[in-house]
């Protein structure tokens, strides 16, 4: 009997696609730096110019699923951050970074198609 082959990083990444907008936004936030949950929510609100405001249930439910899928990992609080000992920090994993790259490429292709087909009116 031959040994069971583990899926490659690329296979694991492709199995996560397509992403929900919430997962995409969290990965984008963590691609810049490690953050705690409320920092992720604030960053997303800032880079979407208020267009996306994540409530605690959506944010932490999605974070839990992303931890289970190994897209992100939790960290100890950085030295000097004693604001709240319960605060958990998160970091994007190599798998999460590859998923973000693949989803960005997929969405760029869709946007390119929309432009070529003039799917929307320009001012």
Task: Give residue spans per PLM region.
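A detector for short, charged/polar N-terminal pre-domain segments
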Residues: 2-20
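Amphipathic alpha-helical dimerization/coiled-coil segments
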Residues: 3, 95-123
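N-terminal helix-turn-helix DNA-binding core of bacterial DNA-binding proteins
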Residues: 14-58
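The N-cap/first-turn positions of alpha helices
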Residues: 20-23, 86, 96
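Basic amphipathic alpha-helical segments that dock to polyanions
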Residues: 59-66
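Beta-hairpin "wing" of winged helix-turn-helix
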Residues: 67-85, 91
